[in-house]
Structure formats: C-alpha cells, structure tokens
Amino acid sequence: LHGTNRRQRQMCIRDSRIFVRRAFLDTLGLLPTTHELADFVGDKSAVKRDKLIEDLLNDNNNYAEHWITFWNDCFRNSYTRQYHGGGGGKITEWLKKSLIENKPYDQFVKELINPVQGSDGFIKGISWRGTVNASQVNEMQAAQNVAQVFMGLNIKCASCHDSFINDWTLKQTYSFASIFSDSPMDIHRCDKPTGEKATPAFLYPEIGEINPKAKRPERVKQLAEIITSKKNGRLSRTVVNRLWAIFFGHGLIEPVDEMDNPTWNQDLLDWLAMDFVNNGHNVKHTINLILTSKAYQMPSVPLDEDADEYIFKGPIVKRMSAEQFLDGIDMVIHAASDKFEQRGTGQKRAGLRNLNRLMQTLGRPKRDIVVTRRETVATTAQLIELSNGKAVADLMSRAGEVWSKSGHQPETIINKLFTTTLGREPSEKEKESAKEIVGKNNDPQGISDLFWILAMHPEFQLIQ
C-alpha cells in the first residue's frame, strides 16, 4: 500500500492540481478554492500531501456533510419519507453528529442495531402503504439491511425462498429476522405460510448465539454485541472494502455487497481490516491511510469493462456525484466575490437537501431500498437534463448575473471561472475563445454560456 520503489514513485501524480482536486472531492465533496489550490501548488514541502489529507480530515463539519450522503443511501434516509413510527429527522441529526465526532465504527454500528435516542429509524424500517408481502415486514427489512450494510450479505432472495444466488436458506433468514420481532414469526415461502415458526438466531452461530427465550430488547442487544465483536471479522472487512471501493472505483471484493466472493488481494484486505480494528475502529484513520498511500496517488485510469480479470493499475476515473456537482456549481457562483475564501458556500449542502428532479437524474436514489454504491454510467436522461434542463439553465443564468455584477474585468472573470471550475488557468486558445463568448462588457448571457461550457467539461465532471 505504501510501496516506495522507483516505479511506484514515478507513477505518482506529478500534477499537484489534479491531486488536490481529487483529495478535496473524495474527502469533503467540495472543490478547492483558488486560494487553497495556489497555496498547495506553491508549497515546496516534501510532506505537503500528507499535511493536506490531515487538514481535510480535520474539517469535521464539511467531512460530515459529505459522508452523510453515503450513509443516507445505506440507511434509506430520504428526509421526506418517515421511518416506521417516525424518526427520519432524528437519525439525520444523530448521523451528522456521529460523523463530526468520528464515532468509533463498532459503537456506530451498535447504536444503529440496538438504537439510542435518535438512531432508531434504520432498524424500524419503512412502513409501506397498503398490503406488503412477508419479505417486506419491518422485522425482515431490519434483517436484510443489517446483513447487507454491515456484513456485505445479500439475504433478500432467501427472504422469500431458499436463495438461488447463494447458500442462505429461508429458515436462516427468518431466524435472523426473528431477533427483531416481539412475537414468534411465522415462516412464509413465496408469501404463503409454511406452518413453521422461526427460532431467533444469528446467521453465524459459531460467532455468537442469541438467547431465543430472551425478550426482543435483550436479543437485539445481544446481536449488536455479536456483530461488533472481534470474532466477527466480516464487519471490519466489509467497511474497509467499501472505503477502498469508494476511493479506487473497484473494491477488493466485488460486488461490495457479496463479501463471500473471492478477493483480488486477500493479504491487503486482511491487513486493512486488522489495522482498522487495532486502531479503535477509526474510520478517519483508515481513510488517511488510504489517501496518503502511493496507491491512491497513482494517476487515474479508465474502467476496463472488457477485461476478464481485474488488475489494479490505479484509481479508476469516476464521475462527480449529484451532490458534488451541485455543491461545485454553488461554489463557482459564490467565488465571484473577492471575500470568498472559505470552503463551501455557507449555504445548505446538496446532500442535506430534499431530492429533486435534477438530483435524481444525476444519480441520487429515491432511498426506498438500500444503496451502498450508486450507478455511475452516464445516461441519456442526464445528457438531456444537463444540456437543456430548466434547473441547470437557472443555475447558469444565476451565475451569469452574479459574475457580471462582480466588478471584475472580463479577463479576470475568465481566469477565475477556469481556476475555480477546472482547477487550472485557460490555455491561450481557450482564453481567446472565452473572450469572444464573454464580450467586453461582462454580458451576463455570455458569462452564463462560458460557465455552462466549463460545467459540462470532463475536467469538471470527472474526478481524475
């Protein structure tokens, strides 16, 4: 991971601007300001990259407001739909506070499985309107979601019948779901009762046993202790695999929700998981370990979809998320002011806003199911929305108006738009073309058109 041989040193990103932009977006979900970019490029320290990562991880609020998006996808926290018995708003507050505090991951998981005040929405599940089938009752939702999010297990198929895709049985799934039930659960196969009742049990009884005679609160407490115990190496392996997949575009095990699949580097997975546990289940520690590694600092590579076997060559180029795109647009608009030197805009981050059409088109899920990894393949709908959509047009028009009234000369506006949006100054050819678009009188429409061009540019939308 931290190899220092000559070949690896040569393969590290030479362009500081690319690295700092990657680090900002991956850690905080934000673009660096022009001042932060210039300061980093001008820093001659040999350890400036390590210092940058440390600084970014210490920005607790922006860190939390970025990573809350990932966990909201996992927990189906849509902001608008209430969990069973309420609690949507409360889990948002609990989650953000937990991320700001960098709560140890084992404690984080315990408080979600055996809820404290404010964290109970995840286990309560969603109460769907009308009649639901047996595989979507709240107890079964809890079992499916705990297995998927924290252990990388897919038991949804086995919630209806013995699984066709793995070895989990209907009886095992109902036994697991029964831990969350106040009364004995009737087993249903394909929504028809079998006449059997399930006995509460953990999926891996060799790791820990649930007392079937205990009341529900005690059973749930036992489960939280078992899942977060050192015996359950699956918890740590699952989360470090998710982190690796987020930063590199490909997990050590794929898919990330099928942790029984073979890994392409067992030693690395085991070492990362062991280091994670030995350092107090500290998520930021593992992120720092990954982001300061030579592996992370290698040049990005395109996804090779035709390869028979995955071979690590560096981080895979990825698209901005819906939230990163919208936060980036907001930052460029606010950068028109000379007083703008802070990270973020002071406005409500996109990840904390309700879902709208533009966000959904750009890939934010409705959160009616658990999503641990979003689709990243570009769609025709995205192309249409970005090129002709009213929401994007309104954002670009607003940018044109704000920058037109900034008091800057046209050339200054052009340079600032390029450096804020793409992280670099325009080439001479680009500068001449931009001057023709903007005009001599800071035409709002011309500025809007230039910003639209830059916002559609791969250098803006891709994290390289």
Where would I find each of the regions flagged by the language model?
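Short, structured secondary-structure elements
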Residues: 7-10, 14-206, 234-274, 283, ...
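Short, exposed "boundary/linker" segments that immediately precede the start
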Residues: 1-2
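Conserved micro-motifs of the catalytic ATP-binding
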Residues: 423
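Hydrophobic helix-coil surface modules that form long, contiguous segments used
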Residues: 223-224, 383
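Extracellular beta-rich ligand/substrate-recognition surface
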Residues: 213-217
